[in-house]
């Protein structure tokens, strides 16, 4: 059909519509129609609604005009308004969400195919049998209930185009709380669970002397006085054995994994130590240089280049990790009990059998500073937090002092920020977790003598350990790289393992 013919047809329709409208206005507002009313006896047999013949043949006047307009390919100006009046609850096409799928059977299904007159429903003459059943249900639902807000399509802003996938998830999944994801570690109660022992696959190490988690893999190294070191997979359920390293007539007093994760060092009371290549599974026996007679207590620097070890009569030896070369020897008052590295590998803090703590400067190869541990008579252990803000010292009297690391250089008798007196026997070991939010303290002289402290509140968890928890005599502890696990080395065969549920990953 050409455009000229369409325009002519539209003009005829408009004139026809105006004529019909004038006739409608001239008619009275209400026309009384005479209707045959059957008797009561005939009412049951007759069950119909009388419809004018002109409506049956041609439909409503407005519908007739609409159909005529469609036949000439044009749309009346007020069609949209009429559709909105007929379906007030129906959303605009632009506001409608795109259906995830469409079923052609739903479009073909009509009301007459579903709705059948029964003795319960009565006559259904008020329904249009040729109407789509889908539209019928939609209109019925919208009449009963308004569309909920969550079903309304929101207008997308230009600023939301760069929203990350995480924000998309948080916006669509309502039960995820952004604040809960970034919440702080609870300071009153700790959510934990004791899982299977770390060395449950063998229990062959004897009295465990040291534990260390691998820095990059989900594995842990357990060494004992039987001269056996085992690497276990850490999952909290099976904890399968991955590899064994046996050293004949060499009781393992201390073992450490290098920060690179490819090499491990094992020391004892012998005048030599072992370096083990974890990738090639090869061991190297190295003789201690100089006058060194044992290596039963040592630590590897965070950079992996140096090893500091305790000697006789307060001697502190500094070795190279690769070449086994003695770089320097320091001397302090009293027997060396413990030491810890600074994160930049430039300082070593050492505690001894006296009340003094020494700070060694590796650049100048001298003792940079000495201060007295407040209230301490005999020192036992020392640990510097990973964030370099807190320094924890443990004494033989069972007291744990917490210092501000920067403030210890300003005085020879600094005052601690916090003092823990929850344990009554010598503090054997101190360990901070990776985020410096937890401090684990233990004593090997009493059963189940270990506690966890929360920072920055500086409070001790009252529910850890549990009231009837049996762990044994704890000699040392270790956190996994992301603090999800906490393991204890004991004087027995077991290495208890705890899962800290607040921390995710490994």
UniProtKB/Swiss-Prot annotation:
<keyword id="KW-0698">rRNA processing</keyword>
<keyword id="KW-0677">Repeat</keyword>
<feature type="repeat" description="WD 1">
    <location>
        <begin position="203"/>
        <end position="242"/>
    </location>
</feature>
<dbReference type="Pfam" id="PF00400">
    <property type="entry name" value="WD40"/>
</dbReference>
<comment type="similarity">
    <text>Belongs to the WD repeat UTP18 family.</text>
</comment>
<feature type="compositionally biased region" description="Acidic residues">
    <location>
        <begin position="1"/>
        <end position="11"/>
    </location>
</feature>
<dbReference type="GO" id="GO:0005730">
    <property type="term" value="C:nucleolus"/>
</dbReference>
<feature type="modified residue" description="Phosphoserine">
    <location>
        <position position="165"/>
    </location>
</feature>
<dbReference type="GO" id="GO:0005634">
    <property type="term" value="C:nucleus"/>
</dbReference>
<dbReference type="InterPro" id="IPR001680">
    <property type="entry name" value="WD40_rpt"/>
</dbReference>
<keyword id="KW-0539">Nucleus</keyword>
<feature type="repeat" description="WD 3">
    <location>
        <begin position="372"/>
        <end position="413"/>
    </location>
</feature>
<keyword id="KW-0597">Phosphoprotein</keyword>
<protein>
    <recommendedName>
        <fullName>U3 small nucleolar RNA-associated protein 18 homolog</fullName>
    </recommendedName>
</protein>
<comment type="function">
    <text>Component of a nucleolar small nuclear ribonucleoprotein particle (snoRNP) thought to participate in the processing and modification of pre-ribosomal RNA. Regulation of cell size by ribosome synthesis is an important parameter for stem cell maintenance and function.</text>
</comment>
<keyword id="KW-0217">Developmental protein</keyword>
<keyword id="KW-0853">WD repeat</keyword>
<feature type="modified residue" description="Phosphoserine">
    <location>
        <position position="102"/>
    </location>
</feature>
<dbReference type="GO" id="GO:0032040">
    <property type="term" value="C:small-subunit processome"/>
</dbReference>
<dbReference type="GO" id="GO:0006364">
    <property type="term" value="P:rRNA processing"/>
</dbReference>
<feature type="repeat" description="WD 2">
    <location>
        <begin position="331"/>
        <end position="370"/>
    </location>
</feature>
<feature type="modified residue" description="Phosphoserine">
    <location>
        <position position="164"/>
    </location>
</feature>
<feature type="region of interest" description="Disordered">
    <location>
        <begin position="69"/>
        <end position="126"/>
    </location>
</feature>
<dbReference type="GO" id="GO:0034388">
    <property type="term" value="C:Pwp2p-containing subcomplex of 90S preribosome"/>
</dbReference>
<comment type="subunit">
    <text>Component of U3 snoRNP complex.</text>
</comment>
<dbReference type="GO" id="GO:0042585">
    <property type="term" value="C:germinal vesicle"/>
</dbReference>
<dbReference type="GO" id="GO:0030532">
    <property type="term" value="C:small nuclear ribonucleoprotein complex"/>
</dbReference>
<feature type="compositionally biased region" description="Basic and acidic residues">
    <location>
        <begin position="24"/>
        <end position="37"/>
    </location>
</feature>
<feature type="region of interest" description="Disordered">
    <location>
        <begin position="1"/>
        <end position="44"/>
    </location>
</feature>
<dbReference type="InterPro" id="IPR045161">
    <property type="entry name" value="Utp18"/>
</dbReference>
<feature type="modified residue" description="Phosphoserine">
    <location>
        <position position="104"/>
    </location>
</feature>
<dbReference type="InterPro" id="IPR036322">
    <property type="entry name" value="WD40_repeat_dom_sf"/>
</dbReference>
<dbReference type="GO" id="GO:0048132">
    <property type="term" value="P:female germ-line stem cell asymmetric division"/>
</dbReference>
<feature type="repeat" description="WD 4">
    <location>
        <begin position="469"/>
        <end position="505"/>
    </location>
</feature>
<dbReference type="InterPro" id="IPR015943">
    <property type="entry name" value="WD40/YVTN_repeat-like_dom_sf"/>
</dbReference>
<dbReference type="GO" id="GO:0007405">
    <property type="term" value="P:neuroblast proliferation"/>
</dbReference>
């Amino acid at each position: 059909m050409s455009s000229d013919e369409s325009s002519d047809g539209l003009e005829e329709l408009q004139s026809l519509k105006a004529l019909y409208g004038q006739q409608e206005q001239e008619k009275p507002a209400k026309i009384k129609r005479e209707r045959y009313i059957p008797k009561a006896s005939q009412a049951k047999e007759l069950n119909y609604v009388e419809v004018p013949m002109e409506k049956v043949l041609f439909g409503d006047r407005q519908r007739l005009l609409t159909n005529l307009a469609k036949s000439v390919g044009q749309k009346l100006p007020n069609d949209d308004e009429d559709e909105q009046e007929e379906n007030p609850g129906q959303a605009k096409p632009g506001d409608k969400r795109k259906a995830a799928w469409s079923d052609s059977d739903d479009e073909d299904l009509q009301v007459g195919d579903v709705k059948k007159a029964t003795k319960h429903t009565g006559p259904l003459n008020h329904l249009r049998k040729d109407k789509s059943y889908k539209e019928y249900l939609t209109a019925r639902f919208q009449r009963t209930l308004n569309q909920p807000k969550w079903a309304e399509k929101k207008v997308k802003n230009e600023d939301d185009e760069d929203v990350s996938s995480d924000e998309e998830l948080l916006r669509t999944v309502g039960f995820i709380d952004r604040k809960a994801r970034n919440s702080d570690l609870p300071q009153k109660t700790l959510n934990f669970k004791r899982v299977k022992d770390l060395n449950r696959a063998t229990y062959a190490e004897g009295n465990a002397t040291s534990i260390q988690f691998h820095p990059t893999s989900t594995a842990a190294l357990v060494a004992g006085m039987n001269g056996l070191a085992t690497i276990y997979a850490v999952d909290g359920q099976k904890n399968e054995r991955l590899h064994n390293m046996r050293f004949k007539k060499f009781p393992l007093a201390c073992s450490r994994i290098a920060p690179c994760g490819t090499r491990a060092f094992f020391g004892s009371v012998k005048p030599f130590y072992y370096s083990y290549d974890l990738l090639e599974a090869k061991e190297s026996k190295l003789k201690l240089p100089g006058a060194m007679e044992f290596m039963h207590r040592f630590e590897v620097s965070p950079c992996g280049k140096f090893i500091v070890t305790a000697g006789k009569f307060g001697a502190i030896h500094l070795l190279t990790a690769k070449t086994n070369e003695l770089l320097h020897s320091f001397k302090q008052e009293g027997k060396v009990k413990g030491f810890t590295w600074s994160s930049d590998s430039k300082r070593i803090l050492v505690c001894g059998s006296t009340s003094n703590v020494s700070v060694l400067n590796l650049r100048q190869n001298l003792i940079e500073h000495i201060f007295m541990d407040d209230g301490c008579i005999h020192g036992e252990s020392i640990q510097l937090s990973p964030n370099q803000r807190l320094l924890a010292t443990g004494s033989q009297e069972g007291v744990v002092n917490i210092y501000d690391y920067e403030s210890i250089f300003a005085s020879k008798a600094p005052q601690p920020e916090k003092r823990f007196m929850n344990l009554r026997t010598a503090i054997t070991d101190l360990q901070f977790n990776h985020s410096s939010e937890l401090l684990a303290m233990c004593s090997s002289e009493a059963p189940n003598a270990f506690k966890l402290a929360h920072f920055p509140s500086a409070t001790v968890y009252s529910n850890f350990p549990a009231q009837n928890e049996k762990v044994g005599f704890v000699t040392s502890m270790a956190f996994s790289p992301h603090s999800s696990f906490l393991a204890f080395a004991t004087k027995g065969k077991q290495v208890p393992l705890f899962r800290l549920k607040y921390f995710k990953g490994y």
